[in-house]
Amino acid sequence: MADLTWHDALDPEQAEEITRLLAEAEEVDGVAPVGEAVHLRLRPGASGSAHLLARADGVLAGYAHLDLLGDSDGNLVAELAVRPGSRRAGVGSELAGALLGAAADRGKPVRFWAHGDREGASGLAARLGARRVRELWVMRRELAGLPEVPPLPEGVALRSFEPGRDEDAVVRVNARAFSWHPEQGAMTADDVRLKEAEDWFDADGFLLAVDGADRLLGFHWTKRHDESMGEVYVVGVDPDAQGGGLGKALTLAGLVHLKSTGLRDVHLYVESDNSPAVRVYTRLGFSRWKADVQYAL
């Protein structure tokens, strides 16, 4: 059995150790075992998390993250990873059991993310009796051969995001555009500022659609992952500005920006049951690449 310890905060050595484990898992599996939000919570001073470390023979064998802030539906959210060299020894089951116990102690339900929908995760879910409740598709296309950017609605212009000026407006539009979404709709100005400090942040690739009074109507936040891959990180349009083609224009303008930086491919995330969005992205040349699955008990 592994030695399990809970931590409300991590020291730099623990954070570095966890980062190495996550990198090992991603290299072997071809998919990151945890989402971006978990990586941000590894930073000094980050709050709202319970970190679970599993050690075996003095080695960090596994890591689990419990998001105590949860989603907008009142669920705690869990993600876990097992070091490749420590797999098939029950570490994943021990981590999952401890996460379930921690959620029960808090009197809250918990959801588990399985990134990449890998066989090991689905097997663990089956042993726990968990059911699939969400599937988040990753859709992808090449940046070559993009459709033309359609004209913007009358009176609307595009400009780049300005740090220190636009955070509150982005949060306002985001909350209205994603009021239905368990995670995205909860984004705060502090979340935006935290991501501004990331190496990948590029204000020129954060496109804002504004009216004549500079009131924000929508935005396309792009992200560069490496020398070849970009991401449609978030596209949000105020409900009052929807229906006039602004979302499509913003999406394509962001793709053109990513292509101009020398990238070859782009991906995005979309709920599998959001049929209208899937149809829009399919018409824009995207196709399903892989999926992340969320489980509940």
From Swiss-Prot:
Entry GO MF terms: mycothiol synthase activity
Enzyme class: transferase
Listed EC numbers: 2.3.1.189
UniProt-listed InterPro entries: Acyl_CoA_acyltransferase, Bact_Acetyltransf, GNAT_dom, Mycothiol_AcTrfase
Signal peptide bounds: none
Domain N-acetyltransferase: 8-153, 156-297
Binding site for acetyl-CoA 1: 80-82
UniProt: 1D-myo-inositol 2-(L-cysteinylamino)-2-deoxy-alpha-D-glucopyranoside binding residues: 36, 183, 223, 231, 269
UniProt KW tRNA processing keyword: no
Keywords of the record: Acyltransferase, Repeat, Transferase
Family matches, as CDD domains: NAT_SF
Superkingdom classification of source: Bacteria
Annotated acetyl-CoA 2 binding sites: 235-237, 242-248, 274-279
Pfam families registered for this protein in UniProt: Acetyltransf_1
Catalytic activity reported: 1D-myo-inositol 2-(L-cysteinylamino)-2-deoxy-alpha-D-glucopyranoside + acetyl-CoA = mycothiol + CoA + H(+)
GO BP annotations, alphabetical order: mycothiol biosynthetic process
Keyword Acetylation among record annotations: no
PANTHER family, per database record: AMINOALKYLPHOSPHONATE N-ACETYLTRANSFERASE-RELATED-RELATED
Function: Catalyzes the transfer of acetyl from acetyl-CoA to desacetylmycothiol (Cys-GlcN-Ins) to form mycothiol.
Assembly with partners or alone: Monomer.
NCBIfam families: mycothiol_MshD
Family: Belongs to the acetyltransferase family. MshD subfamily.
Name of the protein in question: Mycothiol acetyltransferase
Organism expressing this protein natively: Actinosynnema mirum (strain ATCC 29888 / DSM 43827 / JCM 3225 / NBRC 14064 / NCIMB 13271 / NRRL B-12336 / IMRU 3971 / 101)
Name of the gene encoding the protein in the UniProt record: mshD
